[in-house]
Amino acid sequence: MSKLFLRILAASTIAVGFLALVSIPSARAKDEPVATAALTESDLAFLKKGLAKKPKDSELGTLKATAMMLALYSQNELTGSDAAKAAGRRDLALTIAAALEKKDFAAAKTALEGWATAKDGDPKKTVKLHEQHAFELSELMAQFSLGRSGGRHIEADLKAQAAKLTDVKLATELGGRVATIGRYAALMPAGDAVGPKKQKWDDLCNEMIKLGNDAAAEGAKGDRADKPALAKKLAAINLNCKNCHDVFKNN
């Protein structure tokens, strides 16, 4: 098997489609979201680092959101060949989120350490993830904040890579992460997203999902990725964020 084929195969794994969190009322929701192997690895590492010491209060929202992201990645794999394992990991991710909600950091760390050996769960069990453990929009969006503020540095990385794309792997991860955040956000509207503004929220979230998927799909090409095109896709995500904040100023 050639090294080129292996590189293409590895890159393609991040572009495999997965199911939506729940149905989102828009044609945009039919777009295939990106797969999760690289995102899962990154999120597990982030949680491990964050729980290596007692987290600061400013870090709690992002840590909890990261656990909820892991839950969604796993729930989206419930129709695969390892559905029972995916269900078990979804449940374990929710256990981590629940422990973080209670500030039981020892329990969160213990649950995280059991990720690789998670017990099988029930793939037929439906869980409305966005309704679990008092998950809030502010926690979801905290991931965009700077690392020193407890975030995942998403906004800063998006702007930097859009201005000068230097890291295709990072750009791919950013796209996948943005798409996943968009799927949650579509079901967690801002408090002032009512009346005509609710439709605006839906439109912006669905655009966010599509733009994230597009960036991740381009980045998944690895060495064959069109870097100028990928940078433009990241710039489009930045514009989507700006447009959202222009309407929903307190979110």
Tell me the role of every PLM-derived stretch.
Residues 16-26:
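C-terminal segment of classical bacterial N-terminal signal peptides
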Residues 1-17:
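Bacterial N-terminal signal peptides that target proteins for export
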Residues 29-251:
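Mature extracytoplasmic or organellar-lumen-exposed domains after removal of signal/transit peptides
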Residues 10, 24-30:
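Polytopic transmembrane helical bundles with strong interfacial aromatic enrichment
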